[in-house]
């Protein structure tokens, strides 16, 4: 590690991470989304620096960065068949099911393959040790009791979206092993995926395939209804030979944002 990085990793006056829940008010039963607030912890500072360094490892054309990019992609898609069907896939509890050892190995492998002259900033050995420190065996407090996260990556860690992206990109590279008809259109935002299939009969076969790619990862799906499907905050409608989009607001969306 060079001196600049070493100084950045030094943390003084750190505090433990704290777990809290965010209610998913748009879902039945209002389940809680576990979020680990790591701000102020030693792991948070290390994770922030690693996230900045590892961004260059992520270059996945299947991902969209936001709703605007998704809309641009879908509006430029020309319908190829009158049997086309829109489907959205959602991964069940993605972050807590990411296998840490496997994903850390992927990060180190990509670092070895893509980073030239990497010894100037961070060796592969140091990268592995820092990734393990900032994601594995992370102590946290919940309800005034101490716990330790041993697998999965905490929603609240600066590394969570990046490591999820690297892990899922590795799964997506296995799509070439699918012996059926691949989706005509595929794009993903974190754990939400929008797909267009040539016909409805292709959906179940592909869903079965992706659900067999990794024991930790399970996909659920939603089919279009009356030529319409919601994805992110967008409502997509198929009209003649084009797709059109509208802003889609969830039933509990007030339109206000907290400061």
Model regions and ranges:
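Hydrophobic side chains in beta-strands
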Residues: 24, 37, 195, 234-238, ...
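Short helix/loop capping segments that flank catalytic or ligand/cofactor-binding pockets
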Residues: 30-34, 44-46, 58, 96-99, ...
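Conserved polymerase palm-domain catalytic core
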Residues: 62-213, 224-231, 239
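A conserved non-catalytic segment of reverse transcriptases
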Residues: 132, 221-259
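Short, conserved non-catalytic motifs in the polymerase core
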Residues: 4-6, 20-47, 86-89, 95, ...
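A residue-level signal for beta-strand positions that form part of recognition/binding surfaces
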Residues: 16-19, 86, 228, 244
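Non-catalytic, regulatory and substrate/membrane-recognition segments associated with hydrolase enzymes
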Residues: 1-76, 84
């Amino acid at each position: 590690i060079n001196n600049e990085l070493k100084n950045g990793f030094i943390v003084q006056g750190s505090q433990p991470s704290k777990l809290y829940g965010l209610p998913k008010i748009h879902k039945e039963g209002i389940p809680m989304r576990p979020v680990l607030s790591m701000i102020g912890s030693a792991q948070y500072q290390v994770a922030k620096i690693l996230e900045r360094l590892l961004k260059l490892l992520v270059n996945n054309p299947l991902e969209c960065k936001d709703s605007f990019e998704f809309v641009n992609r879908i509006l430029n898609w020309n319908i190829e068949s009158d049997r086309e069907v829109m489907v959205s896939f959602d991964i069940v509890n993605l972050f807590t099911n990411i296998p840490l050892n496997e994903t850390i190995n992927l990060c180190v492998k990509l670092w070895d393959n893509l980073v030239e002259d990497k010894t100037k900033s961070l060796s592969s050995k140091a990268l592995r040790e820092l990734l393990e420190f900032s994601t594995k065996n992370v102590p946290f407090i919940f309800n005034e009791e101490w716990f330790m996260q041993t697998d999965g990556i905490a929603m609240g860690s600066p590394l969570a979206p990046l490591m999820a992206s690297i892990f899922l990109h590795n799964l997506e590279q296995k799509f070439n092993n699918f012996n059926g008809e691949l989706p005509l259109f595929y794009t993903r935002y974190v754990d939400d995926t929008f797909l267009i299939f040539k016909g409805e009969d292709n959906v179940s076969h592909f869903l079965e395939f992706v659900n067999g790619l990794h024991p930790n990862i399970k996909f659920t799906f939603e089919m279009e209804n009356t030529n319409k499907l919601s994805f992110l905050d967008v409502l997509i409608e198929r009209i003649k030979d084009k797709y059109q989009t509208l802003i889609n607001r969830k039933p509990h969306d007030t339109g206000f944002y907290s400061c």
